[in-house]
Design a protein with these regions (language model features):
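Conserved active-site alpha-helix within GNAT-family acetyltransferase domains
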Residues: 85, 89, 114-144
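C-terminal "cap" of GNAT-fold acetyltransferases
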Residues: 45, 105, 112-116, 135-157
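Acetyl-CoA-dependent GNAT
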Residues: 3, 10-81, 89-94, 98-102, ...
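Conserved SAM-binding loop
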Residues: 8, 111
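Generic domain-boundary/flexible-linker signal
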Residues: 69, 118-122, 157
């Protein structure tokens, strides 16, 4: 599968079971179905579909902030069998484009210290670390908070 083979589209309620299955496959402390159900209206809750199956998703929101809205990538995963094919990068870029379109100026996210692949992707896309949060995850692992300025990101595209 190459990046052009995957279709990125807004999530639909019918996708939630597939999203939860990917969540459970990818994370040791997965979000429950109802958490995703509450997020259906987020501006950048997108899925990647390949050959009729959902293989990844991203959930990102927007919060007003005195004319410089802040986006937050809340959750992001690609099924292990669909990794290393550009699906994650395409999902992330699609979410950033959508957030920019609704007026978001800066996007932030948290990433596990041990998640080298994700940290590399985020660095490639212009995210910069701004702080470390000790014991952020339930298992005690630290997180890095990363941010990207969407005006700079879009200028670099």
């Amino acid at each position: 599968m190459t990046p052009v083979d995957a279709t990125i589209r807004p999530v639909e309620r019918a996708d939630l079971l597939a999203v939860v299955r990917i969540e459970r496959t990818c994370f040791s402390d997965p979000w429950p179905y109802d958490a995703f159900e509450r997020l259906l209206e987020e501006p950048a809750f997108l899925v990647a579909e390949w050959e009729g199956a959902v293989v990844g998703y991203v959930v990102a929101d927007s919060t007003p902030n005195h004319g410089r809205d802040i986006g937050h990538v809340k959750d992001f995963a690609v099924h292990p069998e669909a990794r290393k094919r550009g699906v994650g990068r395409t999902l992330l870029r699609s979410a950033l484009v959508r957030l920019h379109a609704v007026g978001v100026a800066v996007v932030r996210l948290e990433v596990r210290e041990s998640n080298a692949a994700a940290r590399s992707l985020y660095a490639d896309e212009g995210f910069d670390p701004i702080r470390r949060i000790s014991n952020y995850y339930r298992d005690g692992e630290d997180a890095f908070v990363l941010v990207v300025d969407l005006a700079e990101w879009t200028a670099g595209e």
